[in-house]
Amino acid sequence: MGNGERPPARRPDSSGSPPPAADAPAASNHPFSSHDTKHMTSRRLASRTAVAASLSALMLAACGGDDSANAPTAGGAAPLTPAVASPAGPTGSTPGSTPGATTAPAPSSTSAGQLSVDKMAFAQTHVVPSGGLSWTLPNASASLRPISRRDALVLVAIGQADAVQPVLEAWKDGAKLGALALSPPSALPPTESGGRAYANDRWSAVVPAAWMVPGVSFSVSASNYTSSVAQAPVFGTDADVQLTILPFYLFGADDTNSPPLSTTQAPDAATQQEIFAKWPTAELKVRTHPAGRFSLATVVVGPRADRTGAAQPAYPVTALDQQKDGYGVMSAMLTLITNMRTANGDGPLNNQYYAPLIALNSNGQFANLGGGLGGVGSGAAVGDHRYTGIFIHEQGHAFGLNHAGDEYAKGAYPYAGGSLSGSVWGYDPNHREFLDVLVPTTASSYAKCASSHQLDAQGRCYKQDPMQGGAGDQSSGYKFATFSDYNTGRMQAWIASRVLADPASSTGYSKWDSAAQARAPYTPTTDNNGLYGVNQNLPVQAGVPVHTIVVSFSKAGSAGASYIYPPFSYTGNLIATFDPTSAADRQAITVDKGTYPWYCKGTGCDYTLRVTYADGSRTYRVLQGGFRAWWTPTVDDANATNPLSGSSFRVWAINVPGDKRIGKIELLDTPMVWNGMPANPTVLLSR
């Protein structure tokens, strides 16, 4: 864009305080969704289907405590006009078809003596036809494709009842990769909780991840028939997802009085396997943040309404029961972890951050958090340490999912009331069983689901999506409920949209090209003239010692709300930032004239961080964003000094070089610093 073009719409700012949404539990000032529900070696989870066969995932919304309170009633909103349906897989009430989604037709033109394949699908998170699924809704669209480079259970319906010893053949570039004997329908994996069979006519085999790649086609032959017409699946991204866990121990919580780090720093192995089974990724890598944990005695909650709905100024908290509403501390911690993720250069990448919050009340007792928060599409969420329904729901928000019932009402979710009525069935490779769209008999919600769930013609309950009251709809032995095919497709789209750190790329980065079904080299660019950072805030130095510094500041002067958090140090990344003592750096961020002319134009550049190291050396960094009126960086916002407005409060996070110990951290007042650095700037805060 040219410097003189119309300003872009203001992006919701996790550092500041956008207006709350109408359904917040208490009016909030953060663009996040809520849900009332020691350093270690990175864990890598590749696809486990083959092993299982052989051995046996910015607006505010609120949820209720156990996730069931938000389930719609059986007589929910009238259905929206669905996407054009083309039967090709199981329905919600009758196994064997796919309503609500458009599927690609199977190849035809079978000749005499040639085996015919009526249906071919691949079970990974869901049973998906080889051509994928797609939806066009009044206010949204989505698709779900087979996941590239992930094992799959292939399901084949053969046209001839007398086919003998059918075999699945894989081909690429005219070469045969191999063949797999198909197991008969009688050997099809069972359904969870001993439920109804998925189908009675599907032959099956486990296809290795190496064959589940673009360019591979599959055909079926038999000893008494020649090979069928080949089908080439349309694949989705082969990207992995890295899940980074950073536990926050708050208000004196430690291993002696609270769940220890050994249990909070990562989900256990079985839970990691179940997360992988639910998320449409080729690989799941779980790691504890290299800092281990973040221990805080004080947390600053930004301006927000209390439990009665009355607006409150920003305030410090030193015990969980001091917060004035149920989401105050969670909101503050979500802002911190979101900004820390950006400061570490992880913002555009294929990763998710989750922060278990371990907190004490004023009596020194461990406090039950009772919920979580997730920034919609932000890649970050906070919640409890149990890694159950709260976790999977909040990370759903981090993937870009809103509450499914709300989205259905807005024409952006295809199934009534946020249910799975119309979704294809799911599949779990760890248990090696199908996941019905109906609530199983062993689910905790089963006995009373009729009063809160959508019902089929026989009065049976459809599952709710985890983004709308689904917790409790899973079979005994599972931690997580089943996502709909539609929401899984949206998670796949989020993953496909991410930048991948890719050593095989000439630029070091790649992105998935959906049309080409391949990764393409990606060159980072600076969008919007630097309005939201340089080169998408990707690292300029990676794997180096860093100190992360977080500062909260109340321009209204709210008591205790201006605070420099204790820094923490680890091996991380540095993104492009600017030194206001450097004339070249000041020129680069000069409003409307510099190399990055919009870097300071949004809400100003009026504050500088000065870090003095133990050896006496110093580093200075401009803190982007402040309290100016949008697109008028020389004039204060009308609410900049209103203590009840989010516009008076900001949280910055920045990484600085960590090769030396810090002696002092100071926040300096440097108005319109692109015009020049004051010789003796006022020190606003010091630590």
From Swiss-Prot:
Active site: 394
Xref: Pfam families: Peptidase_M66
Sequence positions that bind Zn(2+): 393, 397, 403
Protein EC: 3.4.24.-
Enzyme class: hydrolase
Keywords assigned: Hydrolase, Metal-binding, Metalloprotease, Protease, Zinc
All copies of domain Peptidase M66, residue ranges: 233-501
An individual GO BP term: proteolysis
Record-given protein name: Dictomallein
Origin species: Burkholderia pseudomallei (strain K96243)
Phylogenetic lineage: Bacteria, Pseudomonadati, Pseudomonadota, Betaproteobacteria, Burkholderiales
